[in-house]
């Protein structure tokens, strides 16, 4: 079948391997993006190329080694699986994937799609919530190649997404007697919201509202937090790791944690949440720390992606 329409799924990216040099190369590209670190280049680049890229890669490499599998990066493996499953569901499209940082590169994959005869491409960033730090870099990269390509900005309000998210939590929540559900989102600097008008915080809050409403949770049964703080700047609060340390002292000994901003396991879920935060919780007197994994290779999530594409198709045609 000659497919003239294409879907390009885009995830953040991952180092080629968990070796220090590959991690350094990845971090240099990621942290060097002016949309990710919004500081004057003359100030930030010497810091990045100085102490950060000398110290952080080795530390990050050790973290990656704890989550690396025989297939390599979990994020890469699950993104490939999501792509293959979506292709199986949408034979009317040529479905491929790319990474914002690292390989396969967005520009390369789009060129390959065009060369194979795909004329109408829709780019779907694998982030339910829009942010200047995640979706916007994809939009900017795509614009440089072809400003007519449509990029879907977010899908946090798609009901099938919040239904699936609630369902993934409900099974564990009902089977165990947890004191609290923690909905932990990747954080961003506060100034990106207050000064740059990033919609991310509002979309995260809306996601939490929709999910806890579906779960029927009372206000005291859940918390909304932000993880992965980097650098001295003030970030969105409360910080997940701070609350995780405080909760046992508030007689909250059994928690279930979920990270709705991630649709596939990666360093932030497998190491930061499931290992690092769990250790902090237990060290401070916590007893049960369970984790709801992202959707990963769930066929039900692939169906959500298909619905997102279909809704976008209708909106574009209208």
UniProtKB/Swiss-Prot annotation:
CDD domains: Ferrochelatase_C, Ferrochelatase_N. Keywords: Cytoplasm, Heme biosynthesis, Iron, Lyase, Metal-binding, Porphyrin biosynthesis. It catalyses: Fe-coproporphyrin III + 2 H(+) = coproporphyrin III + Fe(2+). Its EC number is 4.99.1.9. InterPro entries: Ferrochelatase (IPR001015), Ferrochelatase_C (IPR033644), Ferrochelatase_N (IPR033659). It is an enzyme of class 4 (lyase). Pathway: Porphyrin-containing compound metabolism; protoheme biosynthesis. GO terms for biological process: heme biosynthetic process. Coiled coil: none annotated. The keyword Iron applies. It is found in: Cytoplasm. Its main location: cytoplasm. One of its GO terms (cellular component) is cytoplasm. Disulfide bonds: none annotated. Involved in coproporphyrin-dependent heme b biosynthesis. Catalyzes the insertion of ferrous iron into coproporphyrin III to form Fe-coproporphyrin III. Belongs to the ferrochelatase family. This is Coproporphyrin III ferrochelatase. It comes from Lactococcus lactis subsp. cremoris (strain SK11). The lineage of its organism: Bacteria, Bacillati, Bacillota, Bacilli, Lactobacillales.
């Amino acid at each position: 079948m000659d497919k003239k329409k294409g879907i390009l799924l885009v995830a953040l990216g991952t180092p080629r391997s968990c070796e220090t040099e590959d991690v350094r190369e990845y971090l240099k590209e990621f942290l060097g993006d002016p949309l990710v670190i919004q500081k004057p280049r003359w100030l930030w680049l010497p810091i990045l190329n100085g102490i950060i890229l000398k110290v952080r890669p080795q530390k990050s490499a050790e973290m990656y080694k704890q989550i690396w599998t025989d297939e390599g990066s979990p994020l890469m493996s699950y993104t490939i699986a999501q792509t293959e499953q979506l292709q199986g569901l949408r034979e009317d499209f040529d479905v491929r994937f790319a990474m914002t940082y690292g390989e396969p590169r967005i520009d390369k994959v789009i060129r390959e799609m065009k060369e194979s005869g795909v004329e109408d491409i829709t780019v779907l960033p694998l982030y339910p919530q829009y942010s200047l730090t995640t979706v916007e870099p994809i939009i900017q990269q795509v614009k440089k190649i072809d400003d007519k390509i449509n990029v879907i900005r977010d899908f946090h309000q798609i009901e099938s997404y919040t239904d699936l998210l609630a369902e993934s939590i409900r099974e564990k929540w009902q089977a165990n007697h947890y004191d609290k559900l923690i909905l932990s989102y990747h954080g961003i600097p506060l100034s990106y919201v207050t000064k740059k008008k990033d919609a991310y915080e509002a979309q995260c809050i809306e996601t939490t509202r929709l999910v806890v409403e579906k779960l029927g949770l009372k206000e005291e049964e859940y918390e909304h937090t932000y993880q992965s703080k980097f650098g001295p700047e003030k970030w969105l609060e409360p910080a997940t790791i701070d609350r995780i340390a405080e909760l046992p002292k508030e007689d909250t000994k059994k928690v279930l944690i979920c990270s709705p901003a991630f649709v596939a396991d990666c360093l932030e879920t497998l190491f930061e949440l499931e290992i690092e935060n769990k250790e902090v919780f237990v060290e401070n007197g916590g007893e049960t720390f369970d984790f709801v994994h992202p959707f990963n290779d769930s066929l039900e999530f692939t169906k959500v992606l298909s619905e997102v594409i279909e809704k976008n198709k209708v909106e574009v045609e209208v």
